[in-house]
């Protein structure tokens, strides 16, 4: 019986780890996670109020991830003017996020997805590693995904999100 349970658990966790990432036009999967200060953040908190730029990244304090976080930091005012809330997500601990935020003066929350539930829900886990791929989702106030960026280049993430926002303004 224990073996059947273990096999079922392994199958389920493997399926979640390799779930497809949602695409533009899909309903964004709901999520709930704790930020660097232990505050619960839920996608539903923003429904009907704000767009959400949910960006997943591999690791605090690494070159590309720091560049990406600082890029969003430098543009968070512009994004806020467009009614966008920036939320970062990685497998790092709340303590690591607190240090990362303090070191680089980040001005948006980081979800400590230490168990990988949020990453798995969005299909962005890096294989079996406790690490997320670099993927960003722009989620509308209606809960639908407006744009997905999955390139490894952190600068492209912001530029593509900005272009998607500019496209919204024109329509």
Q: Could you say what each language-model-derived stretch is?
A:
Residues 132-171:
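Thiol-/selenol-based redox modules, centered on thioredoxin-like
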Residues 28-29, 51-52, 133-135:
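Short loop/turn microsegments at loop-to-beta-strand junctions
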């Amino acid at each position: 019986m224990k073996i059947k349970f273990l096999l079922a658990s392994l199958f389920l966790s493997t399926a979640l780890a390799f779930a497809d990432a949602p695409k533009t036009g899909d309903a964004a999967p709901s999520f709930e996670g704790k930020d660097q200060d232990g505050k619960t953040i839920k996608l539903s908190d923003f429904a009907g109020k704000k767009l959400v730029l949910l960006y997943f990244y591999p690791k605090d304090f690494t070159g590309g991830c720091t560049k990406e976080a600082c890029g969003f930091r430098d543009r968070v005012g512009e994004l806020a003017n467009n009614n966008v809330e920036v939320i970062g997500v990685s497998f790092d601990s709340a303590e690591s996020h607190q240090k990362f935020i303090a070191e680089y003066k980040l001005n948006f929350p980081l979800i400590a997805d230490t168990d990988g539930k949020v990453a798995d829900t969005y299909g962005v886990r890096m294989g079996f590693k406790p690490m997320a791929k670099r993927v960003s989702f722009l989620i509308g106030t209606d809960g639908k995904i407006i744009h997905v960026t999955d390139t490894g280049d952190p600068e492209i993430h912001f530029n593509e999100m900005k272009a998607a926002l500019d496209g919204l303004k024109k329509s």
